[in-house]
């Protein structure tokens, strides 16, 4: 059975056909609409899936935000242009006339990345560092989403009580500091207004402020990982996302994690499926029908 998998992120929308063998075909992308209106997202999703839906038997959505009863509830509305709520399952069922499931994108990615690990591992945490910071927890070989869909939203744990206000309403969240948006927001002077990709490029060229911003992000993530180890005693942490997979970033995180006491050390791995983990995880979960 072929699944039409959709990944809704803060920067882009992606869709692909995924067969029972896990192979990705006909992958497509569109920019995420920067609009507070649900119609803008509906229109973008319609354009994205219309060329693919005739070739699928079901739809699986991986989306940023809390997924509860098939709807997207934005924990940080800034990640979707200010959109607070969107009926994901209902909308895609209307657009495609296909049975549809939805799950948080980082939770979906965690499940895909778990499948790629050594068979002896039963407990892992996935972290995505991109527009925001998200996560997914696999414990005892099972994906943990929580009764309200909040499990794994580790980007909204505290990093600095005196830090910037996060879009979720808390002060000093990991996401507000370590994410691509957090890196860009903290930039000053000639880097003011630059996005995270530009800041990484400038860091590679020796720009001191850019390097400091990236080190600040990596240090914050390392402290988060130490907290995760203390909370879950996971066997490994897998890091993905556009920032997490940027050249040299994971090595920086490893350097800062090594400065923590040994009890909080844990193996760090780069995401095996890289930017396709959300799509694959959603399809795998649909195939397993465990949601």
From Swiss-Prot:
A GO molecular function held by the record: N-acylmannosamine kinase activity
Record SUPFAM superfamilies: Actin-like ATPase domain
Pfam families, alphabetized: ROK
Catalytic EC class: transferase
UniProt pathway: Amino-sugar metabolism; N-acetylneuraminate degradation; D-fructose 6-phosphate from N-acetylneuraminate: step 2/5
Residues engaged in binding Zn(2+): 156, 166, 168, 173
Record's keyword annotation contains Metal-binding: yes
GO biological process, any: N-acetylneuraminate catabolic process
Keywords carried by this UniProt record: ATP-binding, Carbohydrate metabolism, Kinase, Metal-binding, Nucleotide-binding, Transferase, Zinc
Residues reported in the UniProt entry to bind ATP: 5-12, 132-139
Superkingdom to which the source organism belongs: Bacteria
NCBIfam families: NactlManKinNanK, PRK05082.1
Functional description taken from the UniProt entry: Catalyzes the phosphorylation of N-acetylmannosamine (ManNAc) to ManNAc-6-P.
Family: Belongs to the ROK (NagC/XylR) family. NanK subfamily.
Description of how the protein assembles with itself and partners: Homodimer.
Protein name, UniProt field: N-acetylmannosamine kinase
């Amino acid at each position: 059975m072929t699944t039409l998998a959709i990944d809704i992120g803060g920067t882009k929308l992606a869709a692909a056909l995924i067969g029972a063998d896990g192979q990705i075909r006909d992958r497509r992308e569109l920019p995420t609409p920067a609009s507070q209106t649900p119609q803008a997202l509906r229109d973008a999703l319609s354009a994205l899936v219309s060329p693919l839906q005739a070739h699928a038997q079901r739809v699986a959505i991986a989306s940023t935000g809390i997924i509860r009863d098939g709807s997207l509830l934005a924990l940080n509305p800034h990640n979707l242009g200010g959109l607070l709520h969107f009926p994901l399952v209902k909308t895609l069922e209307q657009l495609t006339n296909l049975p549809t499931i939805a799950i948080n994108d980082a939770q979906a990615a965690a499940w895909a990345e778990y499948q790629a690990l050594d068979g002896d591992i039963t407990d892992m945490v996935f972290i995505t560092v991109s527009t925001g910071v998200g996560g997914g927890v696999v414990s005892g070989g099972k994906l943990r989403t929580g009764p309200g869909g909040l499990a794994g939203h580790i980007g909204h744990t505290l990093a600095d009580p005196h830090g910037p206000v996060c879009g979720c309403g808390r002060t000093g969240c990991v996401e507000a500091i370590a994410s691509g948006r957090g890196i860009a927001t903290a930039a000053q002077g000639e880097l003011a207004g630059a996005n995270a990709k530009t800041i990484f490029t400038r860091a590679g060229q020796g720009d001191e402020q850019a390097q400091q911003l990236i080190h600040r992000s990596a240090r914050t993530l390392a402290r988060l990982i130490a907290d995760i180890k203390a909370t879950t005693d996971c066997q490994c942490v897998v890091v993905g996302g556009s920032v997490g997979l940027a050249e040299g970033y994971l090595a920086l995180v490893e350097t800062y994690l090594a400065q923590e006491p040994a009890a909080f050390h844990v193996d760090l791995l780069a995401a095996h499926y890289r930017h396709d983990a959300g799509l694959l995880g959603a399809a795998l979960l649909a195939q397993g029908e465990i949601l």
